[in-house]
Amino acid sequence: MKQIGTAIAMYAQDYDEVMPRIWIDLDGSGGLAGGDMTWRSAILPYVKSAQIFQCPSKKMTTTPFDGRADDYGYQAGYAMNTVHSPVNAPDPPGGSPLADLAVPASTIVVLDYSGGEWIDYASNVHGFINSDSAVTRHSDGCNYQFADGHVKWYKKTAITCSNSECWWSNQESG
């Protein structure tokens, strides 16, 4: 997962300090379809191997990621937090500028997940993802990659999201 964070940082360096989009609607369908690019497609040139998107602690359950959205990569892999890359933003790059991340050391970008390419925070009633989205395949916890590049294991109940602090969102500094 650390390599994914490094790849996202390298991508941002090449694209004016902007994080990769969750998804780029190449066919104009308005929905994720075969041939569209996802965040994994965007950073693939920086990791050189699609196997990096597979958590080594979980066996592959679907076809390997080939850079197209219709595969959804590995269902036992990693997902990106959509707070930092709105799905409805204009096409490339459309992600959040790094300068907009007020507290990078406590802002989650990628995590262990088994439900597809990304986690849709908009579907949560509070407007942010809750800890139920994380897959706890590592000793009842989950690995989280933060915007500053570090990766840390936490029990899913340790990830805070309240009115004053939310590791899933771009919070105010200070």
Tell what function each PLM region has.
Residues 1-174:
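Short, well-structured segments within or immediately adjacent to enzyme catalytic domains
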